[in-house]
Structure formats: C-alpha cells, structure tokens
Amino acid sequence: MAAPINQPSTTTQITQTGQTTTTTTVGSLGEHSVTTTGSGAAAQTSQTVTLIADHEMQEIASQDGSAVSFSAEHSFSTLPPETGSVGATAQSAQSAGLFSLSGRTQRRDSEISSSSDGSSISRTSSNASSGETSRAESSPDLGDLDSLSGSERAEGAEGPEGPGGLPESTIPHYDPTDKASILNFLKNPAVQQKMQTKGGHFVYVDEARSSFIFVRNGDWSTAESIKVSNAKTKENITKPADLEMCIAKFCVGYETIHSDWTGRVKPTMEERSGATGNYNHLMLSMKFKTAVVYGPWNAKESSSGYTPSAWRRGAKVETGPIWDDVGGLKGINWKTTPAPDFSFINETPGGGAHSTSHTGPGTPVGATVVPNVNVNLGGIKVDLGGINLGGITTNVTTEEGGGTNITSTKSTSTDDKVSITSTGSQSTIEEDTIQFDDPGQGEDDNAIPGTNTPPPPGPPPNLSSSRLLTISNASLNQVLQNVRQHLNTAYDSNGNSVSDLNQDLGQVVKNSENGVNFPTVILPKTTGDTDPSGQATGGVTEGGGHIRNIIQRNTQSTGQSEGATPTPQPTIAKIVTSLRKANVSSSSVLPQPQVATTITPQARTASTSTTSIGTGTESTSTTSTGTGTGSVSTQSTGVGTPTTTTRSTGTSATTTTSSASTQTPQAPLPSGTRHVATISLVRNAAGRSIVLQQGGRSQSFPIPPSGTGTQNMGAQLWAAASQVASTLGQVVNQAATAGSQPSSRRSSPTSPRRK
C-alpha cells in the first residue's frame, strides 16, 4: 500500500533551560488540537512526543460516532457466481462500508467509503473468475429503460405518476447483489414513480432497508444498490430525513470526488510509491469537513464501535460544496423517446400492392413503409370580432412501390366549416359540411355567416381622480387651511356672506395648489371717508393728531381755512380708507422740526421712512418694518451728522437695496425730541401690504391683489406711500411750529398722550 500524500499537521518546538530540554508538539485536526509536552534528550523526546500526538489525533478522529457508511450490495455478474469469494466480499462490504470511486478497468474494483457526521460510502467488487468477469462486462439488458430519461421536477409542480401511467401500488422485490434483478426492478412503473434525482443522478430510496439504488447521470447500466449505515456502530439509518440528507450530499459531491481521485490523487500516489496502491476507501467527515481516500480497513476499523481515522492513513480529495445544506431530493419528470400520436395506413391498395407481381423493385413483400408527413401551419389568422381562423393543411404522401399517392387535406375556413377530402386512385369520399354556431352571452348569434360583426364597445375609460387627490398630504393640508381662513373672512359671525372680497373661493384653491396664498380681505370703498369740516367723524380716536391730520387733511394744523375740503388722489383715498377701517389710533404731535425721507423700492424689500434730525445731532435712526432681509442705507444732513447704515431683519432673504433721501432745506430749528413715523410697502410670498409705524406702535394693512392678477399696482402704491410720507413731514413741521405757543395743548413734548 502506498504512503499517504498528506501528513498530519503538527508543530514541534524544542526549548532548553539549563540542563532541561523541553519538547512541545501541537497537532491540529479541523477545529481540534492536541498539545504534548515532554522533557529529556531532544531526539528521543521529540520522537516520543510526536508518536503520542499522532495517537491522540487518531483517537479524536475515531470519536466521530455519527458517521454514516455507504456500502454497495451488488456484484457485477449478470448471474450470481457459483465460485469465488463474492458472498464473503459482499458481507464484508455491508459491515465495513465500501463504495466504488475510481474508473473501471475490467470491473469497477475501486471502492469508496464515506465517513462523516452523516455519511460513509463503500462498495466492493466481486473477486470472481475471469469467466465471470467476461459475463459482467457484457452489456446488460436495459429493455424499456434504454429510451427512458428524466429531468428534475420544479418545486411544487405536479408531474405524471410515471411514464407507464398510473402504476400499481405493489413494489416488487429485488436482489441488491444482482445487477439484472436491479434493472428489472427499475423497469416497474411503481418504482419509477418513487424515484428521485439530485445532482443529475437518479436514486430510488429504500427506507425499509436503509439503502438506495444509484443511477449515475441517468445511465441505467451503472445502476447499483448502496447500503447506508452508521460508520461507527455499523447500524442502519432509521430516520428518513437523515437518510435523505446523506444520499443528497453523496449525489452532489460524487462527480467532484471521482474527478479529483482519478485525475490527481491516484496518479500522484502511484508516481511517488512506484506501485499501484489499493486505496479503495473514501471517508467523508462532516465533523472535520474533509474527504480522505485510504486503504482497506483493518480489523479494528471494521469492528463496531470504532470510526476509522479521517486523516492519518489516506489522501485528501476535493468534494465540492457538500458541507452546508444542499437541499433534499427532487422529483423527476420522465421523458421517453417521442412516438407519433397518429398513423396513416393505406387501406385501399392499388394494382395489387400486396401481391408479389405488383411489388415495386427493392420493396420486400409485406414491408411497412413509413409515411412522409408534411404539416403546413401557415395562414393562421385570428379576428377579435368573431371566430376567424385560417386554414391548417396537412398533406400526407405515402409512396409504396410507386403504386399509390394519397393526399389528405383538412381545412378550417372562417365559417368554421370543416371539409375533409381523401383522394385515392379508386375512390373519393366526401363528408358533409359541419356548421358551428358561436353562442353569445345568453342568446344565439343570429348574424349572417360570412359577415363581420362589429366588436362590442369597450369598457368606459378610467375616470381621473380630482386634483386634490394628486397632491401631497402637506399641500392638501395647506389648501384646507387657506380655505378655512378665506371662509372666516367671507362669512360673519351670523353666517351671512360678506361682499367686496378681493378673491373668491376658487381663486384661493387655485393659488394654494400653486404654492401661493393671498389673504382674503374686504375691499375698501372707491371714495375716501372724509369730513368736509375737517373734524374726525369716527374710526380715529382722539390723541396727538398728526396722523389724523394727514388722513383728514385737518386745516387747523396746516393753517388752511376751516371750510376747505381736501382733494386726495384715488390711491391716497384707498390708503386712508384702509387706515380708518383698521381703526388706527393717532399719537400726539411732538413740537420739533421733521425731515421726510423717501426710500426708493429695490428688489423685494423697500421702505419709505421719515427721520427727524436735531441741531448738532450725530446719529440717524432709521426703522424699516417688513418681512424681507436686506440692507437699507439712509443719509441725513445735519450739523456734524455722519452716514449711518442700518439693517432690517425678516423671514426671507432679499438683495441689498439703496435709498435716495429727499430733505427739507437746512435751517435753524429749535431743539427738541426726535420722533420717527414710518410707512413701508412690503412684498413677500404672502402678497403685498402697507406697514405704518409710529413710535412703538405698528399696524399692517394687506393690499388686495388685482382681480385679473395681471395689473401691476406697484407704481401707484409707491407713489401713494411717497405722497403720504411727504405730506406727513410737512404736517409734522407745521404742527411743531404751532405747538411752540404756550396756549397749545401740544406745547410740551412730555405731555401725556391720550389713549
């Protein structure tokens, strides 16, 4: 027997401390390792430690009590041999676990045994005489199996019970040691029904005997019975699930093992040893995930209660991916050699076709001539309006000695009329026309044959959903909020509708869907609500009065006649009305000179401011109220007044805006407290509005958008704001001059304001 080509994995380390020499050997096998330590002479200790380590590793490998043995149970003789040691060999195979692995010479004398957590495979060959060997080499009688093939059935698919139809439930007996008996057993339809496949091989699982019949790659001549047993106890596998798992792993790894053994392992061993070794065992150890081929088992390895070594006495071979789950066995879809579903026989011989005198040259008497079949599938037409199938023609020509030509035509017209005509040399048969009516839904189709009935109307088109259902939930919620705000303005507390709104509900929904929301406000009247006498008629509370003077054009503050009637511009009138309807209170006029500053609108945020400057003042106070962010730069002229830049903050970013200042002529002004009143026009995503700020009070007035959405009112609004600011400055200056008199109510800047 040749030496193994894989040696144990051991590591030896020798250390010397003073006069003491310590030898340590570490051996590994899979996930297991053994460490042996000895002291003494280096050479002797090393040899002793190595032997002990090898023995321990072998003991570890022999502790695999769940290994399974596969052993072949048949001889290669077509008839049971009467001489030789076949019986003893077969009995030994059942207990020891052998299976054929390598290629055949005269007889497949190579053997495999597989030992693992689940499997050990073995097969033995017959030691019959040369005469029996020649009989074994003869081709077995496969019979119907020669044309039988199959493929793996899809998971969950229902296949035929067997190629022979519904089989009988009785399973016949077979001799596992006789190949002829196995082949006859496999010919039974009941057996074929129960056969399965894995890895391209066919298997029949005999759970009662803990064995299976293995047909390699569907080649029925390789059929053999394999016994499955525990490699340690040599007992049968009693659990069907475990038995199926072992068989499936064997089928998946068989071709890889066989190829590696015949192409690499065996030639290498023979080259190194110079002799042909009897390495006829294969052990599959799932515990260590290794496959090893080695020589015959000795008495200890063949005995019960001992698992053969998985590494020391053999050579490792590749197995492929069999160590993980490979799945179970699958069903088989059987296929046989296709046979014609119909046949054509000439029943009207012509000219003594069956007589010897009229037999054609080269045609034996009584010979059967295979018909030549032509099938034309062209011209198939389908009309959805009704049944309209084109003709299908089959021409069959049988030439028998040159005596007879027979043509059979089957045609299907658009009216479903079937005409079959058979023409021979002696007779013609015509069959009646068969009319088929196509029934409708609950009533007969009375349409005239041959006419094209218009197709029924199709289903109605799918109705598209409303636009609200096509927008996101966030947008829908915003639309509903905007609608709620509109309805709160459009109806008063009593549920009555309010007229003169800047937009209707449809416009609110449309703008909201586009991401824009304009507040709904009540439009002001077309004329200003002023009093000819110059007195406040309501809406503005009594107070300081300079805002009221601007709104009402008070003649007492401006020095005009008491009966003068103001003539405001239309845009001013709208602003005045909005202020009065908003019930803006006025503040007391301060006795001080004022300078009005107009800021030109730029980009999205601009403001119009009024700034008061005192003599010798070196600071400027500018207030801009809006929702945008930008730089507002103003410059005031006074004694020692520098340029001051301020910044207004809001919720959206805008570009930097510049301002142009319009100031009153410089003149000596009485010193006093400075005060600022600001009117700003603001544009943002919500719309436009006018913001009025006086001191610490501020009021915003939304500007309703135009009815059509196309008219640009920006120029008019800015002109109105500028006019208000200019007038405000003049009125404040005049009020300050008049307030310097001792008898005036507004003589003191510290006078308390009336609320």
From Swiss-Prot:
Biased composition (Pro residues): 452-462
Compositionally biased tracts (Acidic residues): 429-446
Biased composition (Gly residues): 536-545
Biased composition (Low complexity): 10-25, 35-44, 112-130, 139-151, 393-412, 600-666, 740-755
Top-level taxon: Bacteria
UniProt feature, compositional bias: Polar residues: 590-599
Residue ranges of the region described as Disordered: 1-44, 72-91, 99-174, 393-467, 523-545, 584-672, 734-755
NCBIfam families: act_recrut_TARP (NF033567)
Family assignment from sequence similarity: Belongs to the chlamydial CPn_0572/CT_456/TC_0741 family.
Protein name: Uncharacterized protein CPn_0572/CP_0177/CPj0572/CpB0594
Provenance organism: Chlamydia pneumoniae (Chlamydophila pneumoniae)
